[in-house]
């Protein structure tokens, strides 16, 4: 493939999951377009955005999928677990129910996602300290229970948003590098090829 056709070394599909209203779409918008919209419309079904980043000496193209958190869309979104190399489990630090439901989202990951998928727990809206009901310690304890990394973030004030995505992408890149090192002569990794133009977009 010529350089003009492919301007990245690795294509990674990431998934944002969590209850409706926890700010998944805002995290996506902040990371991919460096924007924040407080009146963001609820995602209907599936949306995704693209951002290409540099990790070490590699160009990594991130295809970040935003899934609807409502129960009525659950059957639609389960198909999108397949092929995801990394998943961000997102809750709202001002909404205890969204935190408690992370257990259910984690079980979905265990049921539907590929084996070896990289995970991170994200406590969103950490700028709203006066409304906080879930402590940092609670978030860390849950992440420790799952054996996954944990960060608190804010799309509004742009706290740790980059770190959330880079953390997952870097671990995936490292895993792919090890795999390719063990499989000399293997082809490049290209996840979700052909899906870039197939998403159902929403406002």
UniProtKB/Swiss-Prot annotation:
Matching InterPro entries: P-loop_NTPase (IPR027417), Small_GTP-bd (IPR005225), Small_GTPase (IPR001806), Small_GTPase_Rab (IPR050305)
Motif placement: Effector region: 40-48
GO biological process, one term: exocytosis
Any one annotated GO CC term: endosome
Pfam short name (any one): Ras
Residues carrying lipid (S-geranylgeranyl cysteine): 202-203
Superkingdom per UniProt: Eukaryota
The protein's role, per its UniProt record: Protein transport. Probably involved in vesicular traffic.
Name listed for the protein in its UniProt record: Ras-like GTP-binding protein RYL1
């Amino acid at each position: 493939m010529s350089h003009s056709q492919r301007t990245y070394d690795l294509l990674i599909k990431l998934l944002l999951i969590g209850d409706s209203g926890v700010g998944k779409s805002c995290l996506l918008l902040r990371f991919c377009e460096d924007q924040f919209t407080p009146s963001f419309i609820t995602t209907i079904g599936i949306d995704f955005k693209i951002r290409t980043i540099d990790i070490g000496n590699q160009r990594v193209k991130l295809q970040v999928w935003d899934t609807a958190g409502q129960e009525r869309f659950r059957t639609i979104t389960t198909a999108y677990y397949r092929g995801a190399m990394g998943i961000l489990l997102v809750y709202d630090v001002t909404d205890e129910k969204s935190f408690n439901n992370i257990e259910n989202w984690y079980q979905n990951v265990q049921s539907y996602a590929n084996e070896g998928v990289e995970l991170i727990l994200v406590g969103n809206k950490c700028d709203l300290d006066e409304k906080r009901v879930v402590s940092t310690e609670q978030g860390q304890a849950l992440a420790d229970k799952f054996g996954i990394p944990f960060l608190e973030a804010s799309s509004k004030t742009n706290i740790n948003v980059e770190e959330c995505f880079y953390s997952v992408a870097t671990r995936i890149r490292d895993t792919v590098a090890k795999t390719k090192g063990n499989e000399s002569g293997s082809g490049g990794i290209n996840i979700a090829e052909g899906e870039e133009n197939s998403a159902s977009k929403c406002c």
